[in-house]
């Protein structure tokens, strides 16, 4: 008490790739190579969301020619142009808020906008409108899983704008990638993730905000590129990358995970 303290987060100067992070490159890049739409990277604080976004932009920098504007608080990774042109903006230094920075970015001819965090209704609506007008928006959101992300995002919208926002979300959302970092058997951290792709009937469920149907759809892993957290955790256990005890601690359906692991054994 009464003394100075600091919390330090070391940031690697090198942009990590998907293999180094044990992330599913195919799905993430399938979304990120689209010319427009909204991609949400979700998870709790410290789950590696910024690093996942950095890996996506690093891959795009090697393979495509795009103008990428980032809005971050704070800037973590510095991108060196290879094939892409980067304009990095820090909240509080270069622009007063995410919403103001996002509106300004739309006048700067971006192909891709990285939005460090969606925190309020103005930012959320503007992100959806940016997607609608031909931009790819990559954004983070604090949430426990894919359906929790949808609920939190929807709750940002005022009641009078909710139907309009849900209609935009149904047409512009490409997918949600939700992740958690788990202690692995190799004394490192490894991501466990859940994937929801906006394909098939998902857009109708989004328009009606039918979270029960979306949750059930996600748990049918393998359908339209979806992966449930349960399936991902079971795979990590089968590969002996995490222990069953750790997997259960991070699973929202531990009973189902135990039954699934018994089937694998």
Task: Name what the model sees in each region.
Residues 1-265:
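Short, flexible helix-loop junctions that flank or precede catalytic/ligand sites
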């Amino acid at each position: 008490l009464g003394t100075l303290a600091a919390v330090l987060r070391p940031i690697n100067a090198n942009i990590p790739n998907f293999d180094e992070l044990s992330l599913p490159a195919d799905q993430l890049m399938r979304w990120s190579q689209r010319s427009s739409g909204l991609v949400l990277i979700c998870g709790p604080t410290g789950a590696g969301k910024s690093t996942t976004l950095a890996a996506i932009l690093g891959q795009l920098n090697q393979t495509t020619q795009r103008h990428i504007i980032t809005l971050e608080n704070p800037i973590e990774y510095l991108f060196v142009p290879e094939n892409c042109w980067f304009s990095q903006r820090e909240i509080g230094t270069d622009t007063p808020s995410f919403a103001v920075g996002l509106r300004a970015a739309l006048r700067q001819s971006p192909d891709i906008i990285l939005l460090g965090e969606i925190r309020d209704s103005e930012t959320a609506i503007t992100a959806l409108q940016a997607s609608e007008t031909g931009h790819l928006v990559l954004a983070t959101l604090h949430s426990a899983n894919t359906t929790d992300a949808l609920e939190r995002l929807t709750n940002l919208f005022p009641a009078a704008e909710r139907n309009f926002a849900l209609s935009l979300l149904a047409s512009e959302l490409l997918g949600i990638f939700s992740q958690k970092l788990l202690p692995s058997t190799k004394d490192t951290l490894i991501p466990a993730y859940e994937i929801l792709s906006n394909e098939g009937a998902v857009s109708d469920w989004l328009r009606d905000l039918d979270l029960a149907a979306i949750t059930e759809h996600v748990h049918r892993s393998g359908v339209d590129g979806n992966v449930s957290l349960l399936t991902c955790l079971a795979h990590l256990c089968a590969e002996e990358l995490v222990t069953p005890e750790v997997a259960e601690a991070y699973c929202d359906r531990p009973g189902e995970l135990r039954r699934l692991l018994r089937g694998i054994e």
